[in-house]
């Protein structure tokens, strides 16, 4: 969830909005009652408050997995460009580069206090810690949740050198002054309440910034609802619909505490709130996993792997109770946030080369400024296309307006989605995501073949646009080769 606030109560300079970005993990749109209207048997009233107070997006895109979605948000670049398409593992060398500016680094010259709390997943080494990328403070874990409890498995090697080389680090508390503290392992027991630890740190940081009359950028990342879900006794059985539903209710309560903090500080009326997550639902662990009506799941080329919840409110600026069908991506938030603080030229400036706090950056932002659409939804959104990538860094599909072309398909399901090779197609699969948003008609409709052949004129333009995207890598080459699970 993202919050931008122009409160005179929170900051002496009302042109500098506060920014609070709150994320769930592996939560698909249909797991939130603002989207599902209660059909899943539970409600998320606090998250729904954000949707009801502003804009709910129906065509919002994360990425195919955790690292890619988070990298796209914080850098404003396509994950292929940063080389951060593969899920980061303990001990991996890949991570966010100092050559790629973050939202936090770009906000520091505007006087912001910056804090990141909760899951990071943008690199294992100290050089990758958020406190080395523009954040004043970081407190959280570095990987996907199920990597954290591996040392407790009875088959885990007892050799301390193995754990040192390949094991997960603990929950890290680090600061921009170079201090790094390992607060201990994220054990199965600690997982029950780690989001409460993260929430407490976040609330304290907001209080600190408010007392200092400084604008803040806070990125809050929960472990809910990544597998494996471990709930404290008080959160178990509250819905009667299983562990995922119970976890969602707990997660919604944490969102409520953040919104209540804004009320307590009297800044809610001047705050933009955006809620989202990194990727689509992960079905393989159901019922300890998300659910989606879209085809596929996390780490596939299908909509179910990419569609994420996204909603934004800003009382007095954004009208309440709106629904937008514009295509929007996590990559769009960097230029949008910078526009909200008054910098509408950040994309062009970074492309030419821009010095920020003594460091020169020259990067190609793939995101677009959505602020004009937020303020007046009668204006079309600036994004007309979306490039889908595999975790190995290949273009697998493109959405161009209503139409999607799939060039590489993942035919496997469940865990096999992570193991099976991609099938390179001789001609793209084609879908109209308005007529067929769930990508079913190629195997359900008897007339799909005729419809496909009648729309083959769309193939060449889609290939041209992918080629145009790839051409930008000539001047802005891939930062690093993505990681791999095979040698």
Model segments located where?
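Formylglycine-dependent sulfatase
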Residues: 3-428, 437-487
């Amino acid at each position: 969830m993202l919050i931008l606030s122009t409160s005179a109560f929170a900051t002496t300079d009302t042109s500098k909005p506060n920014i609070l970005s709150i994320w769930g993990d592996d939560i698909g749109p249909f797991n939130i009652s603002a989207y599902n209207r209660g059909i899943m048997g539970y409600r998320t009233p606090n998250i729904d408050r954000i949707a009801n107070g502003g804009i709910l997006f129906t065509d919002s895109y994360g990425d195919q997995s955790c690292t890619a979605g988070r990298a796209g948000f914080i850098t404003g670049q396509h994950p292929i460009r940063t080389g951060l398409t593969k899920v980061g593992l303990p001990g991996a060398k890949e991570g966010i580069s100092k050559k790629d500016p973050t939202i936090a680094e770009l906000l520091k010259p505007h006087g912001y206090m910056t804090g990141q709390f909760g899951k990071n997943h943008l690199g294992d080494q100290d050089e990758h810690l958020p406190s080395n990328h523009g954040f004043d403070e970081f407190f959280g874990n570095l990987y996907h949740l199920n990597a954290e409890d591996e040392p407790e498995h009875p088959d885990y090697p007892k050799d301390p050198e193995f754990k040192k080389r390949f094991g997960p680090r603990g929950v890290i508390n680090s600061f921009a002054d170079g201090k790094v503290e390992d607060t201990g392992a994220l054990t199965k027991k600690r997982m029950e309440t780690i989001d409460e630890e993260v929430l407490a740190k976040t609330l304290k940081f907001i209080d600190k910034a408010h007392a200092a009359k400084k604008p803040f950028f806070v990125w809050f990342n929960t472990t809910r609802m990544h597998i494996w879900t471990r709930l404290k006794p008080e959160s178990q059985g509250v819905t009667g619909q299983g562990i995922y539903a119970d976890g969602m209710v707990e997660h919604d309560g944490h969102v409520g505490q953040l919104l209540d903090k804004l009320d307590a500080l009297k800044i809610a009326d001047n705050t933009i709130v955006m809620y989202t997550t990194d990727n689509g639902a992960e079905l393989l662990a159901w019922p300890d996993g998300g659910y989606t009506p879209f085809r596929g799941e996390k780490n596939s080329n299908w909509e179910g792997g990419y569609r994420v919840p996204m909603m934004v409110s800003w009382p007095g600026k954004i009208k309440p109770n709106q629904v937008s069908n514009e295509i929007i991506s996590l990559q769009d938030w960097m230029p949008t946030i910078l526009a909200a603080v008054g910098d509408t030229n950040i994309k062009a400036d970074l492309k030419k080369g821009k010095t920020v706090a003594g460091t020169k950056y020259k990067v190609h932002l793939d995101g677009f400024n959505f602020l004009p659409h937020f303020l007046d939804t009668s204006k079309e959104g600036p994004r007309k296309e979306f490039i889908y990538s595999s975790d190995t860094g290949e273009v697998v599909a493109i959405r161009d307006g209503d139409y999607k072309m799939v060039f590489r398909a993942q035919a496997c399901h469940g865990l096999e989605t992570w193991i099976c090779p991609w099938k390179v197609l001789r001609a793209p699969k084609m879908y109209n995501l308005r007529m067929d948003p769930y990508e079913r008609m190629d195997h359900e409709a008897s007339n799909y073949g005729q419809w496909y052949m009648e729309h083959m004129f769309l193939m060449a333009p889609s290939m041209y646009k992918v080629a145009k995207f790839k051409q930008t890598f000539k001047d802005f080459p891939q930062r690093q080769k993505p990681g791999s699970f095979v040698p």
